[in-house]
Amino acid sequence: MTFVRELEVASQNSRAFNVTLWFIFIFGLLKLVPFALRFLSMVFDLFVLPPVNYAKYGCKAGDYAVVTGASDGIGKEFASQLASKGFNLVLISRTESKLVALKDELEGKFNIKAKILAIDISADSKDNYNKIYSLCDDLPISILVNNVGQSHSIPVPFLATEEEEMRNIITINNTATLMITQIIAPIIIRTVKKHRESGDKKLKSQRGLILTMGSFGGLIPTPLLATYSGSKAFLQNWSSSLAGELAADNVDVELVLSYLVTSAMSKVRRTSMMIPNPRTFVKSTLRNIGRRCGAQDRYGTITPFWSHAIYHFVIEELFGVYARVVNEINYKFHKSIRIRAVRKAVREAKQN
């Protein structure tokens, strides 16, 4: 007698068996349907929906976008691509010469206005924050990009992390991000309200936007990058909470999650299917603002680059970001990076 035939006989002779089968079917349906809907939503976000129209954020109204960490890498790309959409810019970074060069380039190329401020954010200086306020308070600002960030120089055990590095990571990734947002967000709210009440039909649906750069290091607990991982995980809850607070003020708040991107901070130089360059990553981010992409279960969060989104989705759905196996794989990955970095440092020391 075949297995199917045995099921048929059991079904005919046992009501309890039938009830059990229906329970299994309904339970499976309740699990599979949401999974399928989340997967289809991700695919739709990434590959079907058209790019976001930035007119709703004031690109045609002469509004400004503030970009921190603007002189290199991802921050520089945010500045360039926002300028290409018509936004004026406030560029904040450490190196004045780079800011001047970028200002001249973008003003000449895109016929926009750019203001610059060279400050060392790691100093956590009240004077720095006053300078930001003085520069920005009178400007019509509709976008803030919290891009400035710092990681460890190489993967390192928490107990071996130098105090200065630990303090700098927390100051730059957390304290400065909160302080700058507390300065700029009221200006964004004011700008949006003024546009919406102006009577101009083109501005009646005006919105503001606050983007904060997150990381898979904050999504997934990351041994050997413990301080950095914790600082980015903090941004997840803070940004999502802020999204709820500012929704009534017509300000969209998004945490942008990325895996590896070629940059000075990641120390990765070669692009691949999993590792885009800053231009490609920022293009994906600006294209998909307001959509979850790979972060289907996370409010106010976006994993915009397609391979990062799929990777995020698989980890969340199959294992969970806090699973032991994910933690162990992450530890082995960063341990191998640390070993190579230490060997390289030893070789360079011998050569010198």
Curated annotation (Swiss-Prot):
Superkingdom of origin: Eukaryota
One of the GO BP terms on file: very long-chain fatty acid biosynthetic process
Binding-site residues for NADP(+), renumbered to this chain: V66, D120, N147, Y228, K232, V261, S263
Reaction equations catalysed: a very-long-chain (3R)-3-hydroxyacyl-CoA + NADP(+) = a very-long-chain 3-oxoacyl-CoA + NADPH + H(+)
GO cellular component, one term: endoplasmic reticulum membrane
Top EC group: oxidoreductase
Membrane topology reported for the UniProt record: Single-pass membrane protein
Protein name, entry field: Very-long-chain 3-oxoacyl-CoA reductase
Pathways involved: Lipid metabolism; fatty acid biosynthesis
EC number assigned by the record: 1.1.1.330
Organism ancestry: Eukaryota, Fungi, Dikarya, Ascomycota, Saccharomycotina
Keywords: Endoplasmic reticulum, Fatty acid biosynthesis, Fatty acid metabolism, Lipid biosynthesis, Lipid metabolism, Membrane, NADP, Oxidoreductase, Transmembrane, Transmembrane helix
Pfam families hit by this protein: adh_short (PF00106)
Gene3D superfamilies (alphabetical): NAD(P)-binding Rossmann-like Domain
InterPro entries associated with the record: 3_ketoreductase_fungal (IPR027533), NAD(P)-bd_dom_sf (IPR036291), Sc_DH/Rdtase_CS (IPR020904), SDR_fam (IPR002347)
GO molecular function, one term: ketoreductase activity
Active site: Y228, K232
Organism of derivation: Candida glabrata (strain ATCC 2001 / BCRC 20586 / JCM 3761 / NBRC 0622 / NRRL Y-65 / CBS 138)
Function of the protein: Component of the microsomal membrane bound fatty acid elongation system, which produces the 26-carbon very long-chain fatty acids (VLCFA) from palmitate. Catalyzes the reduction of the 3-ketoacyl-CoA intermediate that is formed in each cycle of fatty acid elongation. VLCFAs serve as precursors for ceramide and sphingolipids.
Similarity-based family: Belongs to the short-chain dehydrogenases/reductases (SDR) family.
PROSITE patterns: ADH_SHORT
Subcellular localization: Endoplasmic reticulum membrane
Segments traversing the membrane: 20-40
